[in-house]
Structures are given as C-alpha cells and as structure tokens.
Regions:
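Single conserved hydrophobic/aromatic residue that forms the stacking wall/gate
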Residues: 1-11
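Glycine-rich phosphate- or other oxyanion-binding loops that anchor nucleotides, phosphorylated ligands
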Residues: 12-171
C-alpha cells in the first residue's frame, strides 16, 4: 500500500489494493468500478512461474481459473459449468495465467505459464463490465517446494518494477 500511494501521486492514476484471493479480487474490483467508473483496469501482483524461463515482470495475455474442476459432471478442468469459454483474453501478447485460491507448490492440473490468486477474477469482472484489462505479474517464485521462502524473499522486489511500468504506460 505505501508503494501504491507513491505511484498514485507520481502517475496520477487511482490505485486500489484488492486483497488476496478471488473473492476479495471480485469484491474490491467491483467497488473500484462503482467508485471510479474506469475505462481500463491494470492489475499488478506476484505470481509463481511454471516455466523456469519466465522471470521478472511479465504481462498476462490469457486467464484461466485453475481450481475450477467440475470434470466429474463432464466439463473441462477450468470450465465453469454452463459457460462455454474456459479462458479470458483481451487481445494482447503475453503469458497464460492460472488463478486459484491456493498458493501453488506443485504443478496444478490445469497447466499455464504462471499461477496467481486474483487475475482471472478481475479479468472476468472486466469482461462482464466491458472494461479493458491489463495485468502485470512479478515472478516471485517457481511454484515449487521452495515457493513459500522464495515469495517471502522476493515479494518486495516487484514494487519498483511496477512503478516503472505504470510510468511507461500511455493513458
């Protein structure tokens, strides 16, 4: 939150803290939309990489809900029952992200480039509300047995990169 205030002051963008997990992400994204009526939402957060070549600050192009599993009912892993699409995209280049409400320390069933706990939820809100969405994730760990320690060691490193990225984005 202190870095959020610095970025708000310098780049004249409204920055909201949305919390951890899909429920917090949806609730706080909807509150921010109601309060500010944005044309675009930009999400920044940490993610674990399932590909050792993916490091640093990356932009996400495609979003999946990795912990949605109604496969016993005949649906694909990641597919919400009675909805056709299992992915959300906004037409940008980038990596794939699987969102779920668990911190990943082993390879999940639905394989994506990176994993997080909020992006799909915000992307879905934006898609349903017809709001453009961009998402940048700082790779804090490799979503493996060392993920907890790596995340603790690396989480603060992404803040500076995000502030730099915000400054480089066009309105």
């Amino acid at each position: 939150p202190s870095q959020s205030s610095a970025a708000s002051d310098v780049y004249k963008r409204q920055i909201e803290y949305i919390g951890v997990g899909k429920v917090n992400a949806v609730f706080n994204a909807l509150n921010a939309i109601k309060k500010h009526s944005p044309k675009q939402i930009i999400n920044f957060g940490t993610a674990g990489s399932l590909d050792a070549k993916i490091k640093g600050l990356v932009e996400v192009s495609t979003f999946f809900q990795r912990d949605m599993d109604a496969s016993p009912l005949g649906f694909k892993v990641g597919q919400t029952p009675f909805e056709e699409d299992i992915e959300i995209t906004f037409g940008r280049e980038g990596v794939t992200c699987g969102t779920g409400d668990m911190f990943v320390t082993t390879t999940p069933t639905l394989k994506t480039d990176i994993v997080d706990m909020e992006a799909f939820a915000i992307a879905k809100v934006c898609k349903l509300k017809n709001i453009d969405f961009r998402c940048f994730k700082f790779i804090s760990d490799n979503a493996d047995s060392e993920a907890k320690n790596d995340w603790v060691d690396n989480v603060s490193l992404g803040a500076k990169l995000f502030i730099e990225k915000i400054g480089s984005l066009k309105d």
